[in-house]
Design a protein with these regions (language model features):
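Hydrophobic faces of well-ordered beta-strands that scaffold small-molecule active sites
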Residues: 12-16, 36-38, 70-74, 93-95
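Active-site-adjacent loop and "lid" segments of alpha/beta metabolic enzymes
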Residues: 47-55, 60, 81-93, 104-112, ...
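Generic structural signal for well-ordered alpha-helices
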Residues: 3, 25-26, 56-60, 82, ...
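C-terminal helical cap(s) of enzyme catalytic domains, especially alpha/beta-barrels
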Residues: 86, 98-134
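Catalytic beta/alpha-barrel core
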Residues: 1, 11-20, 45-48
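Glycine/Thr-rich beta-alpha phosphate-binding loop at enzyme active sites
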Residues: 15, 25-64, 102-106
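Catalytic cores of alpha/beta
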Residues: 20-30, 66, 72, 76-93
C-alpha cells in the first residue's frame, strides 16, 4: 500500500537537549534512523545573538556515544554559530526563525526577500565548509 511505502521511507529524528542524561542519549542514538536533532538551548525557538557554551558541550557528549549525523537547532542565526557548531563535531545546523524573520521583513518585495534569503543561506553554508577548508 502507499502508506506502507511512505512509512518505510520516513526516518525517525529524535531530539536531545542539554538536560538529556547520558543513558537517554545512548538510547536515542541507538533508536534514531535519521539524524539526531541537538537542541541548542532550553526554551522556545527563535534567532539568538549568542551561542551558549552548553551547546558545544552537548555536541561533544553526543559524539561520545554515536557518529550518527547530528544537527543543531534552536536559536542558530549567525555564521559564527555555524562555525563553532561544526568545529565541535556536529554535521549541520537547522535554521528557521532567522529565515522567517527575513521573509517577514521583506514580505512586500519578493525579489529583495529572495536575494536576502539567498545571501543569508549562502553565508551559513560557507560557514559549514570554511571550517573544513572545502569550497562550494
Amino acid at each position: 500500500s502507499a502508506i506502507k511505502k511512505i512509512k518505510n521511507k520516513i526516518d525517525t529524528v529524535f531530539m536531545i537537549s542539554p538536560l538529556t542524561d547520558n543513558k537517554r542519549i545512548k538510547k536515542i542514538a541507538k533508536s534514531t534512523t535519521g539524524f539526531i536533532y541537538a537542541v541548542s538551548r532550553l526554551g522556545v525557538t527563535g534567532a539568538r545573538s549568542n551561542l551558549e557554551k552548553s551547546t558545544l558541550i552537548l555536541i561533544k557528549r553526543i559524539r561520545k556515544f554515536t557518529n550518527k549525523p547530528t544537527c543543531v537547532g534552536f536559536g542558530i542565526s549567525k555564521p559564527e554559530h555555524v562555525k563553532s557548531i561544526i568545529k565541535a563535531g556536529a554535521d549541520g545546523v537547522i535554521v528557521g526563525s532567522a529565515i522567517v524573520d527575513l521573509i517577514a521583513e521583506n514580505i512586500n518585495n519578493e525579489e529583495k526577500m529572495l536575494n536576502y534569503i539567498y545571501a543569508y543561506i549562502k553565508s551559513m553554508k560557507v560557514a559549514t565548509i570554511s571550517h573544513k577548508n572545502l569550497s562550494i
